[in-house]
């Protein structure tokens, strides 16, 4: 009876267009299903977008240190771990989302990863340590993307040749980037624009 109830709930969610799980599309955990936090305002990156993104990142993701700054479902960070990332730091202000990511990591028998219940900008005011890859998928129309990008660049959060992935509303056009960032890839999936950005060393870094 409980199984029938669960299937009925899942069917209603599917008809309503509400996702209650996502699928890891590549790597060690390919095909594994991941539950989403109930009640949390989450917009997971679609399968086909993640597949394209990690094709872009394929040369660098193994052994990389990654930051999933607006983690939500954790889809991007989990995909990175599945494909060999050394570490992913997950940050989200919704405790339900972080608890679900913790449960997912445990279910996957993954190594322990840093999990932070925190506003993204508050997190970036802390002590910085450089990341090789950063995932930036803030809520659309929140105004957080520009501020987060500036803090990542100015406060020492990025390795010299870091890659930054950005998702934003396609209607807003390409994101405004710090001067040291260069747009390398750009694609669209429905109303979502998604971008891969390369960081170049600043002049003061090159002099060291």
Summary of predicted features, one role per range:
Residues 1-208:
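Class I S-adenosyl-L-methionine-dependent methyltransferase catalytic core
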